[in-house]
Amino acid sequence: MVCQTCKCENTKSSFLIRDYEYDFSSVSEYSICKSCNLIYRTHNINDEKANLLYSKKVYKPVKGGFLYDNLKKLNAYYEKYHLIRKVFKSKDKKKIVILDIACGKGYLLEAFAKYKKYICFGVDINYIPDRENIKFIKTDFKNLNIIKDINADIIIINNFIEHIEDINDLYKIINIMKQGSNMIIITPDTDSNARLFFGFCWSGYHAPRHKILFNKNNILKTFSHIKEVNLKTSKLYDPFTNLISYSNLIKEFRVNFSIKLLLKIIITPLLLLMDLLNKNRILMIIEKK
C-alpha cells in the first residue's frame, strides 16, 4: 500500500497490533513509511465493517459509561481552554457556529454549548439525542451537503482524522469551507514518549480502528499541497490515553509473560505523566484563506 502523505511505496518496518480494547484475538498489520514516517494500517476497512466497529452498542465514545464519561468531560474542558486561546479568541463574531465531525457523545461540544455565543452541531454515524444548544445529525462525515448547509466557522476533527480510510475525503471538506473558517484537528502524536515506552501496547494504535497516525512533520506535509489554507501546529496533553496504554500492557502481560513487561507494569504508575512536557497529542489549525 502507498503512503497517503508522500506516496512512497517503501516501508521501514511492518508489525501486528492487537485490538486490546475490544477483541484481543484480532490483529491488524501496520507499516511505517520509509520516507515520512507516517504509520498506517496496511488494509482498508469497508463501510459494513466500520458500522460494526463503531456501533453504539459497543464503541465507548458513543456508548459511554460513568467513569469514561467523566474522564472525557474533564479532558474536554482542557481542550476547550486551548481552543479558545489559540483559535476562538481571534473570532470577534457575536455568534460562532461550531461543527464537530464524528462527535461521539459530544463531550467537547457540551463544553462549548453552555455559552450562548456558540451554536453547536455534531455529526456522527450513530443517533445521538439533541441537547441544549446542540443539534446532532445522524449521517456519515462524507455527507458534504450537510456540512455545506451548516456553514460552520469552526470545524472540529477531534481524534477522528486517524480513523479516515482515505484522506481525500477530508480534503473535500476543506474545499467547501468558507473563507476565514478554521478546521481544528486533534490526533495522537507518534513521536510521543508514550509510544516509545508502551510499544505495541500504545493506545494510539487503537487497532484496527486507526488507519493513519502522524507526527508534527508528516501531518504538515499531508496538507501542505493545499494552497488556499494557512497551517499551524502545536501540542496538547491527554493523560487518559496513557491509562488505556497501561491497561493494554496488563492484558498483554497476562498472555505473554516477560520480565520486560513486568518491569513496565511496575514503573508505569510513576510515569503516567510522562508526556506532560513533551505532550502526546497534535493540535493542528487549518485556516481557510
What are these model-predicted stretches?
Residues 159-163:
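A short His-aromatic
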Residues 186-212, 217-221:
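Short, glycine-/aromatic-enriched active-site segment of Class I SAM-dependent methyltransferases
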